[in-house]
Amino acid sequence: MKVDINAIKELRDLTGAGVGDCKDALTSCNGDIEKAKTYLREQGIAKAYKKSNKDVSDGLVAICIDGNKGAILEVNSETDFVARNEKFQKLVLNLAFLANQYEIENIEDFLKCEYSNNTNINDEIMSNIAVIGENIHLNKIGCLSVSSGVVCGYIHNPIVDNLGKVGAIVALESKCDVEKLKIFARQIAMHIVATKPEALSLGVLDQNIIDKERDIIKKQVEQLNKPASVLEKIIDGRMAKFYQEVVLMNQMFIMDSQFTVSELIKKKEEELGSSINIVDYKLFIINK
């Protein structure tokens, strides 16, 4: 039967279900809106959309690496109980795989992509909400790739392989031996998870972060009652320490504190006989 578009709109307004689901429900119920509402409830779709408005404070981070490209994403749930649910974990890993395949970081665009068997990703998430019984929210996606080099990742305290609460991926561009580069890249990813840098280099650190820290330090040193030129040197010294805390290239490497990350890269370049460039990294921490 042909379904009235106004009936679809009314049913969608009442239930929050998608256009396709509303059309199917009305078709199955011969256009009867009340019966269609019942149909959607029975199918769990209306329930899923209702739950999709609930707050989410837990979840999982997943990574998927394939040679010179990789993806990381964060999917939130309401509780840790669901985060440890096998069905939820499978969904998150599948989404990471698809993010790496599609190489799409925009959530809205990604949700429209095919999941499997003509089902899009958004519909699959809604289906899981209905079955699992908690809201599930795809929070963010990060994708990296290099033409020559590797992308590697690390998950801290994984629940299963490539799945946990904190993770990072990093892209290294180089023409050196791939296997040796992978080992180094994984060490960098582990370092990123441990130190949680705010930026790759000083040049890309948010100016607002710099200005805020400088203002805090300035207020601290004003009480020292020293000449302005001396105070400026003190401020510069403390800012240098701050950069060493928040800028990846300025940080002391956790596995060898004799070197900063920048110095370690130069050392590795000599060792492996090729230039190495950290193109970018992505660090995801649940609800941060």
Swiss-Prot record:
GO MF terms held by the record: translation elongation factor activity
Work out whether the entry's keyword set contains Acyltransferase: no
Subcellular location per UniProt equals: Cytoplasm
* Gene3D superfamilies (UniProt xref): 1.10.286.20, DNA helicase RuvA subunit, C-terminal domain, Elongation factor Ts, dimerisation domain
One GO cellular component this record assigns the protein to is: cytoplasm
Q: Where is the signal peptide?
A: none
Region of interest called Involved in Mg(2+) ion dislocation from EF-Tu, as start-end residue ranges on this chain: 79-82
Q: Which UniProt keywords apply?
A: Cytoplasm, Elongation factor, Protein biosynthesis
Q: Key word Cytoplasm present in the record?
A: yes
Question: Its biological function?
Answer: Associates with the EF-Tu.GDP complex and induces the exchange of GDP to GTP. It remains bound to the aminoacyl-tRNA.EF-Tu.GTP complex up to the GTP hydrolysis stage on the ribosome.
Q: Which family does it belong to?
A: Belongs to the EF-Ts family.
HAMAP family of this UniProt entry? EF_Ts (MF_00050)
Name listed for the protein in its UniProt record: Elongation factor Ts
The species is Ehrlichia ruminantium (strain Gardel)
Identify the coding gene. Answer: tsf
